[in-house]
Each structure stands twice: as structure tokens, then as C-alpha cells.
Amino acid sequence: SYLAVTQWWVTSLNPPHLKAMIPWEGLNDMYREVAFHGGIPDTGFFRFWVQGIFARWTDNPNIEDLVQAQKDHPLFDDYWKQRQAPLHQIKTPLLACASWSTQGLHNRGTFEGFKQASSVNKWLYVHGRKEWESYYARENLEKQKLFFDYYLKKEDNDWKDTPTVTYEVREKFYQGHYREASDFPIPNTQYTPLYLDGE
């Protein structure tokens, strides 16, 4: 996921030598995807993650105390805006991967990255399996290689026929099927409002 996080940031700078990217399940908005979910402070993973960073680099003055920042900046202010990748600046061809299983950490970042990137050539793959199991699955490694071969080696392969969006519809544990779409959110999606009932 850290590789995806850094890709969102670096690619937003549009370095001329960068020809393609594959952000595989990574956040790009620290406030909404890690520190506060729906405005509610995350007191579990966020603290665990930040304390792990501090433990590794105790003498590094560039490491911010994000747990304290979470207390000092409970609203989405300039502090958090500066730590949000400017996704609209991304013009590089991309293959983004999200998972239904990483809700609240990586899937929002991947979906927003795909939607907001200005890239003309972009694809989204959404699976319902375990994060790293999916990343290293033979068929997904082949998908990544096909994408990179097309953009980095200029190979005339089948990548250009890949649907813009491929997503898994889960039926139960390790059972589901894939569908294709022209965009995300899925065109013709019907949203159903849900309301809390006090009873």
C-alpha cells in the first residue's frame, strides 16, 4: 500500500520520465482515509501505524507526530489539505486496483484516485479477495505486466482491449464473478437512501 501512496504523490508532479503507474490499493487523503472516517477519529489502526513509524525512526526530525496532529486538527483544515495528494494533476496512464475488503483504508483512496486523475488512459480493477493474495496472484501479475509492457516497451499486446473497469461481485467466501463497466462509479447505479430508525 505504501507503494501506491507514494505513487499518487509522485505522479501528481508529472515527472516527464514517468510513463505509467499501478497504484495497488493505497490511500491519498490522510484525513478521510486514516485519521478520521466520516469525521470520527480512528483510534485503532491510525495510532498503531503512527507508533510503528516512530519506533523505526526515533531520531528522524522529519517524522511528524500524527497522533498529536489528529488531536490538534479534528477538522479538515490546511494541515490536512497539505497532506492530500492533488489527484487532478495526474496525467500518467494508470491501472488502479481497489478491494472491497479494505474498506476505510485503501478502497476510498483508489476509487478517488481513479475518479479524480486527469489521465486520459486509466483503468480500474476491483476485487473482493485478500489484498496481497490478489496482488501476487498469477493472473494479476500477468495483468500488471501486460499494462507495463504496453506503456513502457510499446508492445502491441491485448492491453488496449482491456475494459475500463473490471469489478468483482461477491456471492460468498471465495465465490463471485467479474463484471465490466465503462466508468466508475458504475453507470446507471441506483442509490438507495437508508435511514436510522430509533426503534
For each of these PLM feature ranges, what is it?
Residues 2, 28-30, 101-103, 131-132:
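Solvent-exposed loop/turn segments at secondary-structure junctions
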Residues 16-19, 72-79, 83, 88-92, ...:
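Alpha/beta-hydrolase-fold serine-hydrolase catalytic core, especially in secreted/extracellular enzymes
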Residues 9-89:
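Accessory cap/linker subdomain of secreted extracellular hydrolases
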Residues 1-9:
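Glycine-rich nucleophile elbow surrounding the catalytic serine of serine-hydrolase chemistry
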Residues 8, 111-112:
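Active-site phosphate/pyrophosphate- and oxyanion-stabilizing loops and adjacent acidic/basic residues
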Residues 11, 114-115:
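N-terminal cationic-hydrophobic initiation segments that often serve targeting/anchoring roles
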Residues 2, 48-49, 195-197:
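Short, Φ-rich (hydrophobic/aromatic) sequence segments
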